[in-house]
Amino acid sequence: MINMTNLDKSVEEEILAIVEKYQKENTKLLNYLIVDDEITFFSPIANGSEITASDLQKVADILKGSFVGMEIVNQEYRFKFKMGI
């Protein structure tokens, strides 16, 4: 079991640089939950643009893991990844 509650700030910044273009203007938030070796990112369905497969792969590469899946719950996207870091 991984006892990690937050990603390193440098990792957060790398991921935010990829996903911020999908967020509302002037909003730079990276909301996530880590459970064991899985991380779920939460992103509001605000501006109608959905993240690309290429950008999902970039996030997976940063996490040294793989993209597991996506779902929409309560007006937000939830992206789940397996982590290798």
Regions found by a protein language model. Give the residues of each.
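Short, flexible coil/linker elements and helix-boundary hinge sites characteristic
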Residues: 23-27, 64, 84
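Acidic, low-complexity, intrinsically disordered interaction modules
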Residues: 29-74
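Disordered, low-complexity tails and leader-like regions
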Residues: 1-4, 41-50, 79-81
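An N-terminal amphipathic alpha-helical segment
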Residues: 1-40
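Polar/charged, Gly/Pro-rich intrinsically disordered segments
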Residues: 69-85
